[in-house]
Amino acid sequence: WASFVGIWPVFLAILAIIFARRKQLPFIVLGVSALLLATCPPLITFLGTLKLPIISNAVAGRIIILFSFSLTVLASFGFDDLVEVLEKRKNFKKIIILSGLMLIFFVSVWLILFFLKPMPTQWLIVAKRNFILPTVFFLGGTFLIVLSFKFKKIIILIALYLLLATSFDSLRFTRKWMPFDPRNLVYPE
């Protein structure tokens, strides 16, 4: 669960990579490196044999936090890029292309879930239910971005929506995956 950032931070991080500037490069390199270290077993095994302090002991679960961190920082750069594009009214094409690709991704996943049924029914029900909210968040934000092409003053509403949608999505994910003890067990009276 340490790698979860939400659908809009991922969108904004990709946007930051598309509009990449020199100051974003260290976070792109950190994100790619952390992802490779966390998901490439031969590389983890090799680093473990080197007996380097911290690096040899770092398990994939700890390294993935660096990926989440870099994705979050890139999302903040992407948000700046989005606001700049919407205020200056140029480079709409990159945002439209990225939104279109994300829309194709969402439609593809829904088609796979409904028609190909790649998993047992009990898992399929959970997968569909878990994909509803990210789809709604994405469509809502995309609608506001498209609306901002016509109404410039809606940018503040977009910022508020992205903040609330990401916060709610993170809270929902946390409550779902992190165990919490009942209050009476933690604070006995």
Stretches with model-predicted labels:
Residues 23, 29-189:
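Contiguous transmembrane helix-bundle modules in multi-pass membrane proteins
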Residues 13-14, 176:
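Short hydrophobic alpha-helical segments that form membrane-spanning helices or hydrophobic packing faces
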Residues 1-13:
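Individual transmembrane alpha-helix segments
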Residues 15-19:
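Membrane-interface helix-loop-helix modules in multi-pass membrane proteins
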